[in-house]
Amino acid sequence: MDTDILRMQDKEVFEAIAGETLRQTETLELIASENFTSRAVMQACGSLMTNKYAEGYPGKRYYGGCEFVDIAENLARDRAKKLFGCQYVNVQPHSGSSANMAVLFSVLKPGDRIMGLDLSHGGHLTHGSPVNFSGQLFDAHSYGVDRETGCIDMNRVEELALEVRPKLIICGASAYSQGFDFKAFREIADKVGALLMADIAHPAGLIAAGLLSDPMPHCHFVTTTTHKTLRGPRGGMIMMGSDFENPLGITIKTKTGSRVKMMSEVMDAEVMPGIQGGPLMHIIAGKAVAFGEALQPAFREYAVQVRKNAAAMAESFAGLGYNIVSGGTKNHLMLLDLRNKEVNGKVAENLLHEAGITVNKNMVPFDDKSPFVTSGIRIGTAAMTTRGMTENDSRTVAGLIDQVISSANSAGVEEICRTVRHDIRELCLAYPLEGYGVNP
């Protein structure tokens, strides 16, 4: 990657980027929410489209000179529709949280009841956490996983829905290794007159590849990030399988009177000007490139390998005596409960960092430790698969992680971390990230 101008103009920023480049290329990225974009995506994101203001939507902008950014946004929208089989898409949200906020604000009033997966059971901040807008502006109620199986108890979901009668049910997670039964969630939502939103930020790439159940036929709204398993730039997106009249009865004047606005109209207005102003057109261009890549046959091969790698790694961990929440994985991630290993998530994360392996500490269901300590770690295979690693490498990595965690309380842990770091560097150099270097 050409960074000569940056190196000459701003050495401090250049050195920060150079250090991050070295970290990404020579250490192993296993954070489940991270991935590596293609050079084409990075070129689009680094293009001069970053200079253009484009408030509004293609063909209806508040600024002139938008003919070319209109092309980029229309490409992103059309490709996303084809990729996910949806009728409506908005590619302007800056993040997954922004996308979720737009949906909630478009169909709810402050104080309305919502239901989502408990954050400590694998949910997300925007699904009703009390420290987030979703839990502060709305009356949030959480469902969780079964203590024995680690899987979502749909009977309990139904019981809670019948009890609290939410206006919106959210199905989605940030640390749940099983799939979601969107059909069952829709049946529950219909029983209580609730709308249903699927947050597929984590498994979006696997869903696009047809490897996990499709939320479009069952959910009123589907939100996602565009990075993670989609391998695009950091951003968000809102989709609907089909359009419908908005449930709040918001109307618009017509030549002959008025009509009820379609949900797509309400949603577009909620994104802009509701919660955002100008879209990030360079990022939207990057989204278009990423969606184009995801439409190619090679992307499905990638997604298949992501699942194979996760399954192989989970099987290896189970064989080494680790407790995997929910008993295994059907997607790209797994959550390890380390309580039987006598080490907490914070210690494990720090030691693995010293060993050249990046994971994140994570609460496990019914955790008795704080979110800053936790009893578990979350591991994902999306990024390592982008490098070209396969099942054997996944098993090797599980063994190296075990070496570090098993020695956490021993006097020789520092030496083991140094040895593992060397092995990890050799593994990463065997699967280089093409085009990610910086000019010295």
From Swiss-Prot:
Gene Ontology molecular-function annotations: glycine hydroxymethyltransferase activity; pyridoxal phosphate binding
Catalytic activity: (6R)-5,10-methylene-5,6,7,8-tetrahydrofolate + glycine + H2O = (6S)-5,6,7,8-tetrahydrofolate + L-serine
Disulfide bonds: none
InterPro entries: PyrdxlP-dep_Trfase (IPR015424), PyrdxlP-dep_Trfase_major (IPR015421), PyrdxlP-dep_Trfase_small (IPR015422), Ser_HO-MeTrfase (IPR001085), Ser_HO-MeTrfase-like (IPR049943), Ser_HO-MeTrfase_PLP_BS (IPR019798), SHMT-like_dom (IPR039429)
A Pfam family assignment: SHMT
Localisation: Cytoplasm
Names of the cofactor(s): pyridoxal 5'-phosphate
Plays an important role in substrate specificity, annotated site positions: 227
Name listed for the protein in its UniProt record: Serine hydroxymethyltransferase
Organism the protein comes from: Chlorobium limicola (strain DSM 245 / NBRC 103803 / 6330)
